[in-house]
Amino acid sequence: GKRVVLLRGASADIIMLAPGETFAISVGGCPIGWIFDPQKPNRLIVGHMGLQCLIDRQLIVAGQKSRKYRSVIDRMWESMNLLPMEASRIQAGYAFPIDPLHYVHQWDYPDSGDNNKRVCEYIAANFGNKCIVDWNNPETRKLGRIHLGNLIRSQYASLGISVENIHGVSTPNAVDVDGHPLWYVTRGPHGKDPRNLVLVTLYQ
């Protein structure tokens, strides 16, 4: 019969779907991502891909690992039990990351500015300059505008997934009749309370 399973914390960050199952998550700017093997269509792995899921912040700022995996994407890949030679056929994607122009990690921010700088430098060095908006400009890079979509794309590509098989959907810019955003983000005008309900289904 039908059943609902509620997950919280780290156990909710990834889930393997079978045909006919649906994954639901409420988000406020964090993207969701997925990995799919067309040769094994009876499973789809879905993950929550907020920044803290994509990098080990404690390792970056304090030099101490806080978990086994660098990123939730690495954990998803292992869960799929795929060989490196199989990566070229894999389909992967993400949806609804916060606009990087709103996702600011300023280097001069009181108390956390130095750590913001370390995080941005780590991301640029390990995943490419395109993960930080205007990284090549010494002044604008200090705004620390992290592009989660490009960070996810870079991590997928590092696994050997073909660029043409990586799909991304940006956060909608839709507004209501009064000009207010219809897509909630925690750093937007609606504040931290509203959320968006995202559903992912693997059809039979």
Language-model regions, residue ranges each:
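Active-site microenvironment for binding and transforming phosphate-containing groups
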Residues: G1-Q204
